[in-house]
UniProtKB/Swiss-Prot annotation:
Biochemical pathway: Carbohydrate biosynthesis; gluconeogenesis
A GO BP entry: gluconeogenesis
Spans annotated as Disordered: 1-22
Molecular function terms from GO: ATP binding; phosphoenolpyruvate carboxykinase (ATP) activity
Subcellular location(s) per record: Cytoplasm
Record's protein name: Phosphoenolpyruvate carboxykinase (ATP) 1
Tissue specificity of this protein: Green leaves but not in roots or etiolated shoots.
Annotated catalysed reactions: oxaloacetate + ATP = phosphoenolpyruvate + ADP + CO2
Record-annotated disulphide pairs: none
Taxonomic source organism: Urochloa panicoides
Primary location group: cytoplasm
Positions contributing to ATP binding: 322-329
Length: 624
């Protein structure tokens, strides 16, 4: 504003946007000012000794020279850390790798990992919603035939080997050879990504895991999928209980013993280590750790489960078991209930707990209308794996299968609005076994006694329809023991015995819910409507079905309710929905025969310490 002052006009200038020049002589100094220093705990060198020990060669018995931070960062380099045994061993095991420093990027934030991913691979992009879209390379799914578990004196007796088992053996020597191959690759890099995180939300039974990988996207994936530690927890993290060496960018030697391809996923339970070679599919890390939990938790008397889990407002918890396509994720995600987890859980004397800190959702044909929670979770921090997007707008086309049908999104569970944090709950009230029966002969819902629950849990049944491209329309039965045979370590009857013990101890109810077909098999009948299935699940949660009237079906001997609010009574007994009763009986007997044939491999095993329970379970199958 102008004002007279002795004939001189003065002005009050608005200089609110003026400031002193920056205290920087170069653009690098300006950039360093832009990034405020992290907390002192993150700058501590204390984890480097432990990480160097993790990266130690078995032959040389010492780890690489490590320095914390990005080698491309400007400014004074951090002080290097050498493994404490390096000086003594260097004289006898000198190598070029011992003369260089490996930079450790330790527990980076999502924003930092985004920047690393963009600088590292041409296949990393930001989508229109802020997610990180990336590619897993030639492998777009797990490679179960390339997974190996070390068979030693202990595991030879403990683990499930042979027909039907997912555990394919290798010896300790070949594991060490593959471990050295992975370490040589990782230690040759200028930088590696290291995550120290936890598994299991139950604080009394959590496991410390360390993931060492060459790709930023893998580090972000595990940041999302494992439980994220606080700064205080990182300061006292110490030595991990289990370590993953992900050298998936480097191939295995296909001509080595026990190898069948250039891909190899190896687990040594004695060493508490996992080695990945020749595959960059991130799901190998997630499911590898799940297998480890299937080994470690039962040793503590804790049942590990491949299931979804949610909790009602009154604290009533339900477990959902089911193979792919049965509706496990859809039905466990309920806006009227809190989500404890969508895939991996533990059941201990403390109740249930989620193993993971995130969700790994399928994205194929994803829509906002059908799966709003997953749709909205795909935002900044989420990893989108192998999706296709518009080159200009970066909008994802979830229907596009050009790369793979197994498109995935990995995000922290906090991205789901009704997630229960911490992800723990009381003992389950209901155990729900889901089956998508494409034969159309199982009832929409059946109440199971204990023996029937164990029989169907061990069977792990669903049915799929062959692809139309080969002209086959006959349904194919799929059996996966404990609804997760690919990941279990012990014989299925061990997990069944633990489930039976907990259901008896806490008085829980088992249910078999068919989310498949009614009125005929696939191609003849119709898929049971999702609203009807939701009404059935609601009736289970509310306790309505505990007081319902029941009748027993033939062959399978299942107890089915005569009526449920909101569900047509005529569909509750599958025989009523078939116009061709003879075809129904023929199909029913066919499925019963498939169940019997599948269960023969388990018939000679004792389930728990109760001989009578074993006999009851064997008698709980179809009778014809």
């Amino acid at each position: 504003m102008a004002s007279p002052n002795g004939g001189v006009t003065t002005y009050d200038y608005d200089d609110s946007d003026s400031a002193a020049p920056v205290r920087a002589q170069t653009i690098e100094e300006l950039h360093s000012l832009q990034r405020k220093a992290a907390a002192t705990a993150k700058d501590s060198a204390s984890p480097l000794q432990s990480i160097s020990a993790s990266l130690a060669s078995t032959a040389r018995e010492y780890g690489p020279n490590l320095v914390k931070g990005d080698p491309e960062a400007k400014g004074a380099p951090p002080a290097p850390v050498k493994h404490q045994q390096a000086a003594a061993a260097a004289a006898i095991a000198a190598s070029d790798s011992s003369l260089k420093f490996t930079h450790v990027l330790y527990n980076l934030s999502p924003a930092e990992l985004y920047e690393q991913a963009f600088g590292q691979k041409k296949s990393s992009f930001i989508t229109s919603t802020g997610a990180l879209a990336t590619l897993s390379g030639a492998k777009t799914g797990r490679s179960p035939r390339d997974k190996r578990v070390v068979k030693d004196d202990t595991t030879a007796q403990e683990l499930w080997w042979g027909k039907g088992s997912p555990n394919i053996e290798m010896d300790e020597r070949q594991f060490v050879i593959n471990r050295e191959r992975a370490l040589d690759f990782l230690n040759s890099l200028d930088k590696v990504y290291v995550n120290d995180q936890f598994l299991n939300w139950d604080p009394e039974n959590r496991i410390k895991v360390r993931i060492i990988t060459s790709r930023a996207y893998h580090a972000l994936f595990m940041h999302n999928m494992c439980i994220r530690p606080t700064e205080e927890e990182l300061e006292t993290f110490g030595t991990p209980d289990f370590t993953i060496y992900n050298a998936g960018e480097f191939p295995a030697n296909r001509y080595a013993n026990y190898m069948t391809s250039s891909t190899s996923i190896n687990i040594s339970l004695a060493r508490r280590e996992m080695v990945i070679l020749g595959t960059q599919y991130a799901g190998e890390m997630k499911k590898g750790l799940f297998g480890v939990m299937h080994y470690l938790m039962p040793k503590r008397g804790i049942l590990s489960l491949h299931s979804g889990c949610n909790m009602g407002k009154e604290g009533d918890v339900a477990l959902f078991f089911g193979l792919s396509g049965t509706g496990k994720t859809t039905l466990s995600t309920d806006h009227n209930r809190l989500l404890i987890g969508d895939d991996e859980h533990c059941w201990s004397d403390n109740g249930v707990s989620n193993i993971e800190g995130g969700c790994y959702a399928k994205c194929i044909d994803l829509s906002k209308e059908k799966e709003p929670d997953i749709w909205n979770a795909i935002t900044f921090g989420t990893v989108l794996e192998n999706v296709v997007f518009n080159e200009r707008t970066r909008e994802v086309d979830y229907a596009d299968k050009s790369i793979t049908e197994n498109t995935r999104a990995a995000y922290p569970i906090e991205f789901i609005p009704n997630a229960k944090i911490p992800c723990v709950g009381p003992h389950p009230k209901n155990v729900i076994l889901l089956a998508c029966d494409a034969y159309g002969v199982l009832p929409p819902v059946s109440k199971l006694n204990l023996a029937q629950t164990m029989y169907h849990f061990i069977s792990g049944y669903t049915a799929i329809v062959a692809g139309t491209e080969d002209g086959v329309k006959e349904p194919t039965a799929t059996f996966s023991a404990c609804f997760g045979a690919a990941f279990i370590m012990y014989h299925p009857t061990k997990y069944a015995a633990m489930l039976a013990e907990k259901m008896q101890k806490y008085g829980r109810t088992g249910w078999l819910v068919n989310t498949g077909w009614s009125g005929g098999r696939y191609g003849v009948g119709n898929r049971i409507k999702l609203p009807y299935t939701r009404k059935i699940i609601d009736a289970i949660h509310s306790g309505e079905l505990l007081t319902a009237n029941y009748k027993k079906t033939e062959v399978f001997g299942l107890e089915i309710p005569t009526e449920i609010n909101g569900v047509p009574s005529e569909i509750l007994d599958p025989v009523n929905t078939w116009t061709d009763k003879a075809a129904y009986k023929e199909t029913l007997l066919k499925l019963a025969g498939l169940f019997k044939n599948n269960f023969e491999v388990f018939a000679s095993y004792k389930i728990g310490d109760d001989n009578s329970l074993t006999e009851q379970i064997l008698a709980a199958g179809p009778n014809f």
